[in-house]
Amino acid sequence: MKRLLFISFLFIGCQNISTEIIVDPDVEDMYIRYNKAWSDGDFETITNEIYSVPFSLYLQDSTVILDSSEDIKNFLIMTFNELESNNYGYSIRNSWESYKIDDNLVIVEQNFTRFLKDSTIMGPEERTASYILRKSEGKFQISGMVPHTTIAE
């Protein structure tokens, strides 16, 4: 009986082990810079350091390919203007939902929350977006994104 009880506790304890996803430190660093730049509406940093050309945006009903830095910059300016009109304040990452690395390619999903300027939650408490990253010249950049909610709301 004691043995059965011990095995039961061991089994229950194993079910509660955290499955926290650990990402490559270079990916983590890039996302810290990305989330800060996004929260600051810093389209220059995102255009020049975070997104790569071409950049693919996979929406629910279409795919948008941004073929130049100028296209990316214009897309970001339009997006940040819409966010500003919706009283957007900032975003925080809550967790990584998934992470897969294959040499110079990464597929990662980020769970995040957006806040209004008064620090109340903007829209859904938890949002997700999936990203395709490519390592080029020693650094990761985002080459594609699948937003699972509307980007500017």
Task: Kindly label every feature range from the protein language model.
Residues 50, 61, 110-112, 146-147:
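A mature extracytoplasmic/lumenal domain signature
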Residues 14-49, 58:
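Short, low-complexity N-terminal intrinsically disordered segments enriched in polar/charged residues
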Residues 71-118:
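Surface-exposed, charged secondary-structure patches
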Residues 55-67:
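A short gly/proline-enriched turn/hairpin at secondary-structure junctions
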Residues 124-153:
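Short beta-strand edge/turn micro-motifs at domain boundaries
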Residues 34-38, 42, 50, 54, ...:
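Sec/Tat-exported extracytoplasmic proteins
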Residues 3-13:
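Sec-dependent N-terminal signal peptides
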